[in-house]
Design a protein with these regions (language model features):
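Active-site-flanking segments in enzyme catalytic domains
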Residues: 1-142
């Protein structure tokens, strides 16, 4: 599994998230620390989004992610936070595709509003599969 092989860890750490929330003056429920290769969460709902950041890192932060963000983020059926920058857009799209992958109505909404992004993630799944980036014990929760 790519996550463990790359030396990453996943941890539920209320103190870390509380400190980060105070430091940034926002309420944080998940964070990815690339230099420490660690995903921190304080709520399960942040898990897939943070694994999206890991996947973005594994792929080397390709320029294509920035292009997709600029072209389609404004119309994508995602929360406002996902529209702040390419990193957040990619992570939220990843989570959206995992959560709604079997919901034809939700996926059609993504396809209609962000067609290039939808195609990108469909091709990515065919090429590598999401299970390569999310440990099985985490993926099985969703």
């Amino acid at each position: 599994d790519a996550f463990n092989a790359a030396g990453w860890t996943y941890c539920i750490d209320f103190d870390y998230m509380g400190g980060l929330s105070k430091k940034l003056n926002v309420s944080c429920i998940g964070a990815t620390n690339y230099s420490r290769k660690t995903i921190y969460i304080s709520e399960a709902s942040a898990t897939l989004h943070e694994f999206g950041h890991f996947l973005d890192w594994m792929l080397g932060f390709p320029a294509e992610h920035e292009q997709l963000f600029r072209a389609e983020a404004a119309a994508a059926p995602l929360r406002d936070y996902a529209k702040t920058n390419a990193r957040e857009y990619f992570a939220d799209c990843f989570a959206y595709c995992i959560i709604h992958g079997n919901d034809s109505e939700m996926m059609e909404s993504l396809r209609k509003n962000a067609p290039q992004t939808c195609t990108y993630f469909e091709e990515l799944e065919k090429t590598v599969g999401a299970e390569a980036f999310v440990p099985n014990d985490i993926a099985n929760i969703f």
